[in-house]
Amino acid sequence: MASSSSSLAFSLSLLLALILCFSPTQSYKTIGKGYRLVSIEESPDGGFIGYLQVKQKNKIYGSDITTLRLFVKHETDSRLRVHITDAKQQRWEVPYNLLPREQPPQVGKVIGKSRKSPITVQEISGSELIFSYTTDPFTFAVKRRSNHETLFNTTSSLVFKDQYLEISTSLPKEASLYGLGENSQANGIKLVPNEPYTLYTEDVSAINLNTDLYGSHPMYMDLRNVGGKAYAHAVLLLNSNGMDVFYRGDSLTYKVIGGVFDFYFIAGPSPLNVVDQYTQLIGRPAPMPYWSLGFHQCRWGYHNLSVVEDVVDNYKKAKIPLDVIWNDDDHMDGHKDFTLNPVAYPRAKLLAFLDKIHKIGMKYIVINDPGIGVNASYGTFQRAMAADVFIKYEGKPFLAQVWPGPVYFPDFLNPKTVSWWGDEIKRFHDLVPIDGLWIDMNEVSNFCSGLCTIPEGKQCPSGEGPGWVCCLDCKNITKTRWDDPPYKINATGVVAPVGFKTIATSATHYNGVREYDAHSIYGFSETIATHKGLLNVQGKRPFILSRSTFVGSGQYAAHWTGDNQGTWQSLQVSISTMLNFGIFGVPMVGSDICGFYPQPTEELCNRWIEVGAFYPFSRDHANYYSPRQELYQWDTVADSARNALGMRYKILPFLYTLNYEAHMTGAPIARPLFFSFPEYTECYGNSRQFLLGSSFMISPVLEQGKTEVEALFPPGSWYHMFDMTQAVVSKNGKRVTLPAPLNFVNVHLYQNTILPTQQGGLISKDARTTPFSLVIAFPAGASEGYATGKLYLDEDELPEMKLGNGQSTYVDFYASVGNGTMKMWSQVKEGKFALSKGWVIEKVSVLGLRGAGQVSEIQINGSPMTKKIEVSSKEHTYVIGLEDEEENKSVMVEVRGLEMLVGKDFNMSWKMGIN
């Protein structure tokens, strides 16, 4: 469950850190004198292998590793890998079976002919990225061939010890950096100099700003404007060990407590190119079922099935869309995974309820935590013990405490665990036909710290007071260097011990892997096992929501941003967190709408649903101890929900097409403005607005008491989606103050776009059966223009999202205006599926046409229209208009009553009267 213990846990960690008197993380200007390159070899696979010798040993943070092996390879035209490890012994790396990628040559294997002692600067050139190096001391730089910019330049000494690795790069001050998460960034999406960015998965509430949270993504995007042209690149340090990354504006320093340096440099040069190339490496985002793009409702505290039934009924009565109803652990028997409470959720009644909602297209999802209750009569525990699947400490299962009380944690690096987990999912699915799984507390969260035993003679937990207070008998574990490493990362923002409120870092996984190394991939490994289990059981496209994430998690799961607050600041922060996860390759993301705790105000919940209706993953979720906050609880919030979610359900075909685009190219569903306008530097720090796709912009109210919003409009024409006669024309880009009364959100569509929509509905299944419309946006008042759009449709629960299976259709839409003629046409790939559904385009709305809007000689597929249709035109009004008054007149033309088949190529044209 989304743990309400988070704020308490954070306070306890702070107190413990103060009690134990942990000194602040030490900062050394220089640790040693680095390494020299003593030889370099060319390998048959096109890479280069070098050997580095330490120049001067020291004992700061441990002994230096004397000899290092350098491996450099241009893996693709746009990706360069730089891998540095111990030359003599294999070191921990992110497992290749979890994150498949090319493996460097084996350590110690000599390849090729050595070129001894080259003292001059050398270069290894690729298509776009150039690797250059010096030999004594060894440094390296990565440059872009096309504009000669240095992207990465190791200016200070390389440090490589068993438990401390350090490397730095210089940066131009004009660079804009994004990423290095998961982190709630109070200052927005753009990284702020002189803030430490700690990467180590923790159950720390997202209300705690600028600290390490649930996921670890050691990747950043660097966007620079060079001579008026934008260039973006990315740097990934693929390492699962805890690390601090210090960004000082003109430099960036990594301080890592284990593993290897495994750098990947991604060339770009556009932000979209970057995520395409990045997800080509880490895995394309998972395809999501259509229903998952609908609205979701959850709460910790739906005490029995009757409450859940009432929630579903009340959404229907309020005419607020709802696709998915969720259970936190209220459905469980004693908080135990894969169980059902026989009193609160009797199986027969639950099955009848699920049969009812499944028939109308609704879905049901429940929570699952990794901790398995230590209970001899509990079947899941019995089978786990028999299969020997738990993480060990000194040969015995490591004991912790979570909601069921004493628990053991499954080791998802063990193949036997994956099989056992899949079997438990099947058993539960046979018991309750769930439609997805929500995996929580998988950082891993533990209510205790250290080595614990179950107390004799007393119940744990006692059943009195909060369930998150540790009731085991525990003692600190500091006897090994894995529990007390020489360098203290800034864990939880207070330099807490790395094993605090989680698994002891000297515990062991399969094949002797230490928790110290594998800690931050626990949630990732659980996600992969859960995905495999659901796929095998359902045979459908899995839907998984995970709190903890790592590099590559987006290939399997969606993410929500954890335990946020019902505050205006949490609302603001939700946008930058969402945008960061799009860059990380996890595009299906959102925050708890209205906040997890405490109770939001009515005004805040109004404004939050106006933002959250456009999160890729849109869910209202609340804490056990907070008052009810379903969207129908306030009349004004219900109005805002019907308005904002009504728009979401109309654009579901567009969102689903973005889901397909994300799966094929990694493109985020929700994007910062600079993704579409990288040359417009005003966008670089904007975290108060966002785009869906390339051209659908949301400009919400984010402050209390405001009834207008100042929105940034990049250059071009923008049309309001709630009243398409309203337009903003921004020649060079400008900020515009727009009215935004309580139940109103500003949503604009950019020029040169064709947007497919449907009529909406209260459930996505119903909305999907309605006729299509196309909104075509040209530059306002243009006598010539061009627009494009896309539409992807399929049988949405098929495991794969692709063309070629006979159950999907892809359409490219085009439109042009010129010489007094408006034309639009489609090019359909594999139209059979769309034709089988009978989908038609019933209406076309064309925005920005120059003139009076007179329409004549409408033709479809080369023949005059004989069917009676309705044509109307309205003149645009401008919030900010064209500067040339003679061109200031433009119109919206709508043609209704069409029956153009989505699954068949068509062309349509008409003549226009121009005044």
Swiss-Prot record:
Catalytic activity: Hydrolysis of terminal, non-reducing alpha-D-xylose residues with release of alpha-D-xylose
UniProt subcellular location: Secreted, Cell wall; Secreted, Extracellular space, Apoplast
Keywords (A to Z) from UniProt: Apoplast, Carbohydrate metabolism, Cell wall, Cell wall biogenesis/degradation, Glycoprotein, Glycosidase, Hydrolase, Polysaccharide degradation, Secreted, Signal
Listed GO CC annotations: apoplast; mitochondrion; plant-type cell wall; plasmodesma
UniProt xrefs under SUPFAM superfamilies: (Trans)glycosidases, Galactose mutarotase-like, Glycosyl hydrolase domain
InterPro entries referenced in this protein's UniProt entry, alphabetically: Gal_mutarotase_sf_dom, Glyco_hydro_31_AS, Glyco_hydro_31_C, Glyco_hydro_31_N_dom, Glyco_hydro_31_TIM, Glyco_hydro_b, Glycoside_hydrolase_SF
Role, per record: Glycoside hydrolase releasing xylosyl residues from xyloglucan oligosaccharides at the non-reducing end. Has alpha-xylosidase activity against xylan oligosaccharides. Also has alpha-glucosidase activity against p-nitrophenyl-alpha-D-glucopyranoside. No activity against p-nitrophenyl-D-xyloside.
Protein name (database record): Alpha-xylosidase 1
Natural source organism: Arabidopsis thaliana (Mouse-ear cress)
Lineage: Eukaryota, Viridiplantae, Streptophyta, Embryophyta, Tracheophyta
